[in-house]
Amino acid sequence: MKLFLDTANLGQIKKLNQMGVVDGITTNPTLIAKEPGEFEEIVRAICSEVKGDVSAEVVATDSDGMVSEGKRLSTIAPNVVVKVPMIPEGLRATKSLSAAGIRVNVTLVFSANQGLLAAKAGASFVSPFIGRLDDIGQRGMELVEDLVKVRDNYRLKAEVLVGSIRHPQHVLEAAKVGADIATMPPEVMEKMMHHPLTDAGLKRFLDDWEKAKKTRASGAV
């Protein structure tokens, strides 16, 4: 499974990208607005840092506007994926953009029916938001399971890109059910690296090594 970061912060991206664990980036207008600089400059800088897919979202709400924005965004870098919302106008834009050879990530997917429609319209990625479903008492991972089954049953080309991830367990569950990609905030990826037994084990190794050095040094005197 590919692991993406859901952020537009270049510092965080560079830090984690150096570890060789970042396959791509997803952004949205909220994340972009938190960073200094112009929208396209931020996306261009991210695309230079990360060689994998970088999703950049349109802000238009009509299909013509989405197509126009999407075509402009696609010229920023070859690894840009145009992100559009799962609304009727978004489906129209997805059909037009994909027909023009531009890859599309359909976002804000909250049902398998929406995901199926997005895939049929030509989306390269379908993004279910599991954390937000959990927030309203539904089990978000059931949606991922349904989308994976539909993808496999009909050999759809759209990849299941799981978003709205809140904790490492979400990532593990997405991997176990066969999602193609999980995108997460940097802090979730950092939490995935740690375990208290790892920290305790390392401390013990280092403490034992220091004791051994002191013993050897005192014995040599």
Question: Which functions belong to the PLM regions below?
Answer:
Residues E40-V54, S74, L91-V104, G140-V160, ...:
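Alpha-helix-loop-beta-strand connector modules within alpha/beta enzyme cores
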Residues N28, V82, A118, A174, ...:
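Conserved, mostly hydrophobic/aromatic
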Residues D6-A8, A60-D64, V84-P88, V106-N113, ...:
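Glycine-rich beta-to-alpha transition loops that act as phosphate-gripper elements at the mouths
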Residues G20-G24, K51, I76-N79, S96-N105, ...:
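Glycine-enriched alpha-helix->loop->beta-strand junction motifs that scaffold or abut catalytic
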